């Protein structure tokens, strides 16, 4: 049995917010980028990998997480996910089984801005 065949709505226990970058002009006329919430959805959240490495005289960390949610056509790789106080960069978006029923998003914790 494929993993997406066994998926059911009861597995979607975590609230995840989908963020979109917007650009406004501040009072001095300079562009200001900010992330605004587009939607909040229920999702299954599964940590899948993590590692630490030494770069630029500091310890860096990578934490990858799999988010599975109901299919949405409006999610793009230039968006972010917010879950449990952390923002995640979208690394991959997969339509599980190609049936537009479940969406799997691979995300990586953003450690700087």
Task: Name each model feature, range by range.
Residues 10-16:
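Short structural boundary motif marking the start of a folded domain
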Residues 1-4, 9-10, 25, 30-113:
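Short, conserved turn/kink motifs that form compact alpha/beta structural patches or helix kinks used as
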Residues 20-21:
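Short acidic, Pro/Gly- and aromatic-enriched capping/linker segments at domain boundaries
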């Amino acid at each position: 049995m494929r993993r997406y065949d066994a998926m059911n709505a009861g597995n979607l226990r975590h609230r995840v917010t989908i963020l979109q970058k917007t650009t406004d002009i501040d009072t001095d006329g300079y562009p200001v980028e900010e992330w605004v919430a587009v939607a909040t959805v229920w999702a299954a959240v599964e940590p899948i990998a993590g590692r630490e490495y030494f770069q630029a005289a500091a310890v860096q960390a990578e934490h990858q997480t799999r988010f599975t949610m109901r299919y949405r056509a409006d999610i793009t790789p230039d968006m972010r996910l917010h879950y449990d106080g952390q923002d995640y960069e979208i690394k991959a978006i997969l339509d599980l089984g190609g049936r537009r029923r479940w969406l799997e998003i691979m995300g990586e914790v953003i450690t700087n801005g």
